[in-house]
Structures are given as C-alpha cells and as structure tokens.
Amino acid sequence: ILKVERTIINLMQRTSGIATQTNKLVKKVGKNVLVVPTRKTQWGLVDKKAVTLGGGGTHRLGLYDWILIKDNHIKLSDPKSYVISPKSFWEIECKTKSQVLKYVKQKPDAIMFDNFKPESIKKIIKQIGKTNIIFEASGNITEKNITSYAKSGVNVISLGSLTHSVKSLDISLDII
C-alpha cells in the first residue's frame, strides 16, 4: 500500500475535486442543460470520468467522436467546402453573431458560442427560432455566471476550468 499511496491519493484528490465541482455546477444549472468539460484535461479520460460521476457529461473523448470545426479551420477554408458524411455529427465554433447566422443555414448538429455574453446568446437563439441544432456556450464561464448561461437557451455549457484548474479535495490515508 505504501508504495502506491501517494499516487492513489493524488488521483483520488483530483478526481474527487472534479466530481464535486461538477456536481455543484450541475445543481446550479438544472436538468435541462448539460455541463461538460473541454478537451483541456491533464488526465484525459480519467478527468472526463470524474465529470460524469459528478453528474456532468462529456464533450468529445477523442477526434473519432465527431467533427468539431474551429476558428483555425474556418480561417483555412470555408466549412461549406468540407465534405461531411450525413451520418457524421458535426459542430462548428462561432465567435461572432454573423458566423452563427451564416453557419446555422448549413444545419450543423451543434453550434458552439465561443466567448459570447449570455444576453447575446439568448437574442441570437430567439432570432434563429425553433431548430434541432444543439447550442453550446463555452469560454469565460464561471461558477458566478453559469446560471445566466443556463438561462440563455443553450443545451450544453462547456468549461475548461472543470479539469484544468479545479481544486483537489484534501484526502489522506490512515493505517489502523
């Protein structure tokens, strides 16, 4: 036990901290919005499992899950030129209202609002109207403002802070 004690305790502290923080945020946003981590994880699948144990969901587990078109891809070529299988799930990251309104016409499975204010998201979603597109908020979302994002009409809220800057719980081992 003593040979692996520190490693096991470190892992337990980290994953317990992630699960606890996730659970706190899940309770704040309610049942209609899914709280997920971003891909910014130190321990990959271990961190993502901790999020699910806390009541959250997972974003992508890897590049094989779905296609995520980010700003760098958009700068290199127009997403209209991409050949995407109708069976593929794809999401596009948008940084401006004009991008959202442009790409919503291409009927992606999901649109990520990157660094938008909750009020802006709410207005844009209202302007788009009823759709089957999943809306995700990401960027600069904190425990203090997460409820505003949850009320904006999004289906998913992704936070890098769930895994890259969570406070580990204080756990120790006593042998009796």
State what each model feature region is.
Residues E143:
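Cys/His-rich Zn2+-binding cysteine-cluster or related metal-binding knuckle/ribbon modules and their
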